[in-house]
C-alpha cells in the first residue's frame, strides 16, 4: 500500500509526495508540470488506474470573467507521471446559463455504479457552494445533479439570523467503518458583514443519499456553529480545538507540533 499527498505550491506548480509508511517519512516532491492550475486531487480506481482532477483555465477562449474548468489526466502509478493530454470534463460549472464562476476543488469518487465528481463553485466568499456530477466512467459523459448545489449558505437565509455561518464549500466526503457518509468542508463565522477573525473553520456534517445523489445540507437550512457529536471511533488523542483541556510540561527540546496553528503568538 502506498500513501499519496498532492497539492499546489503557489507560483511554482503542483507536486505530490508518497510513502509506504507516513510515520517514517515521505518522498521528495515529485512535480507535475503538465498541470496548469490548482487544487489537484488523486483518484485510484479498482483496476489500479490512477487519475488526477484539477482546476484549470477553459480550453480555447474564456467567455466571461471567473469561468474556469475541471480537467482530468490519467496517471501512471509505476512511472509517477501523467499520461497524455488533459480532458476538460467541466466547463464553467453547473447550470451554465447564468455563468457560474470559479469551479474548483474537485474530488473524484467511485460509489456503486457511478463515478462522482464533487467541486466547489462560486468562489470562497458569500456565494460559495458545493456541486456534484456523476458519470459511468471517469472520462464522462458527466450528468449534473438537478438539485445542485448540495451545500451552500448563499440563499434563502436571513443575514440577521443568530450565529451566522457563511461561505460554506470546498467539501470532501468519506465513508465511516459503520457505512455512514460524512462531509468535511470550510465555512466562516463573520462578526460583522464579511469580516471574521478566525479565518476559515472546518466543519463536519452527515451526508444523506436520495435517488443516487448525495446531499450535505438541505437548501435554505442554516449551519449550526455547534452540532451533535458524531458517533465515530476516537483516535485516542486529546483534541486541540473546541472545548478541551491539555497539559504540556514543555520539558522537551522541541515544541510539540500540536502548538502549531493559525497565527502563532510570537512568545
Segments from the language model and where they lie:
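Carbohydrate-active catalytic/glycan-binding domains of CAZyme proteins
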Residues: 1-267
Amino acid at each position: 500500500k502506498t500513501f499519496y499527498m498532492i497539492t499546489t505550491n503557489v507560483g511554482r506548480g503542483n507536486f505530490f509526495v508518497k510513502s509506504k509508511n507516513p510515520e517514517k517519512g515521505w518522498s521528495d516532491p515529485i512535480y507535475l508540470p503538465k498541470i496548469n492550475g490548482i487544487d489537484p486531487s488523486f483518484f485510484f480506481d479498482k483496476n489500479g488506474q490512477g487519475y488526477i482532477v484539477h482546476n484549470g483555465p477553459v480550453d480555447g477562449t474564456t467567455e466571461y470573467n471567473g469561468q474556469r474548468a475541471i480537467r482530468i489526466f490519467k496517471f501512471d502509478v509505476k512511472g509517477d507521471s501523467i499520461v497524455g493530454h488533459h480532458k476538460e470534463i467541466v466547463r464553467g460549472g453547473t447550470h451554465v446559463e447564468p455563468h457560474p464562476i470559479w469551479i474548483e476543488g474537485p474530488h473524484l469518487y467511485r460509489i456503486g455504479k457511478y463515478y462522482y465528481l464533487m467541486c466547489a463553485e462560486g468562489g470562497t466568499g458569500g456565494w460559495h457552494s458545493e456541486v456534484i456530477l456523476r458519470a459511468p466512467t471517469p472520462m464522462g459523459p458527466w450528468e449534473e445533479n438537478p438539485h445542485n448545489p448540495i451545500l451552500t449558505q448563499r440563499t434563502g437565509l436571513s443575514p440577521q439570523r443568530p450565529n451566522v455561518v457563511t461561505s460554506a464549500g470546498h467539501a470532501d466526503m468519506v465513508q465511516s467503518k459503520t457505512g455512514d457518509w460524512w462531509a468535511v468542508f470550510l465555512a466562516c463565522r463573520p462578526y460583522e458583514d464579511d469580516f471574521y477573525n478566525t479565518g476559515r473553520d472546518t466543519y463536519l456534517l452527515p451526508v444523506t443519499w436520495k435517488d443516487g445523489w448525495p446531499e450535505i445540507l438541505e437548501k435554505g437550512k442554516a449551519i449550526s456553529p455547534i452540532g451533535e457529536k458524531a458517533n465515530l471511533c476516537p483516535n485516542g488523542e486529546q483534541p486541540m480545538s473546541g472545548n478541551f483541556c491539555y497539559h504540556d510540561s514543555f520539558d522537551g527540546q522541541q515544541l510539540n507540533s500540536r502548538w502549531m496553528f493559525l497565527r502563532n503568538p510570537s512568545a
